[in-house]
């Protein structure tokens, strides 16, 4: 009888733990619930469209007058996603995930809210590295120089989208993920150099990390203000 009761108690405890785990997994979670993109291979193994090639339209299933989407089809990389306007908030993440026009992930929804809350008429989502990978640890182990070169061409294009009379507002928002790959810091340095040609203003939002990395767009208030980001000092600290 005692042995039976002990066994029954053990089974009940296991059931309770299982229910508790199910409840935890059922809670909303932006990282878990969003669709994932796991790279099929290293991008060096792919035939990459140049940025100019990627500008050529191939689809008409979204409003081109409202959206920037380059390339305009789902691929292993993405150069640009955002809305059209004269005064965009240009957000810089580390690398793209699965978002597309009209199908924004939680990061892009946050970017859109913060852009609107700070008085910008649009947003442009750009990334330090163009490879799609929901999990940063799945990114290329070594920088694909061809992809990087075209991504920098895309960054120039992004800065050129700012209307006359407006200064490019570039929101550094890559978080601590920049530490995932050594080459990412060099990519940022080149972006900053290009930004100087356009007199870009670098911004950040939210609390910076202990090492000074700018906050990722997730988990920021919709009315979170953007503020100056001392990008030169930041680069010196890397």
Give the location of each predicted region:
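Low-complexity, intrinsically disordered or signal/transmembrane-proximal segments
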Residues: 4, 8-9, 23
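Active-site and ligand/interface coordination hotspots across diverse enzymes
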Residues: 6, 31-105, 117
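Short connector loops at secondary-structure junctions
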Residues: 121-139
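Glycine/proline-rich loop-helix segments at beta-alpha junctions forming the active-site rim
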Residues: 37, 139-238
């Amino acid at each position: 009888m005692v042995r039976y009761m002990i066994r029954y108690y053990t089974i009940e405890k296991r059931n309770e733990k299982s229910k508790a785990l199910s409840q935890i997994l059922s809670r909303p979670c932006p990282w878990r619930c969003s669709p994932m993109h796991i790279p099929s291979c290293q991008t060096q193994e792919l035939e990459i469209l140049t940025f100019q090639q990627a500008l050529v339209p191939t689809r008409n299933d979204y409003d081109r007058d409202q959206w920037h989407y380059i390339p305009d089809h789902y691929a292993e990389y993405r150069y640009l996603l955002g809305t059209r306007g004269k005064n965009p908030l240009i957000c810089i993440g580390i690398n793209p995930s699965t978002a597309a026009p009209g199908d924004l992930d939680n990061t892009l929804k946050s970017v859109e809210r913060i852009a609107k809350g700070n008085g910008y008429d649009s947003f442009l989502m750009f990334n330090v590295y163009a490879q799609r990978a929901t999990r940063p640890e799945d990114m290329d182990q070594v920088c694909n120089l061809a992809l990087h070169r075209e991504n920098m061409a895309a960054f120039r294009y992004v800065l050129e989208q700012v209307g006359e009379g407006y200064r490019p507002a570039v929101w550094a928002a890559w978080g601590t993920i920049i530490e995932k790959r050594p080459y990412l810091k060099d990519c940022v340095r080149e972006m900053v150099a290009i930004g100087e040609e356009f007199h870009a203003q670098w911004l950040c939002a939210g609390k910076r990390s202990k090492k000074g990395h700018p906050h990722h767009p997730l988990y920021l208030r919709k009315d979170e203000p953007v503020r100056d980001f001392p990008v030169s000092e930041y680069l010196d600290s890397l």
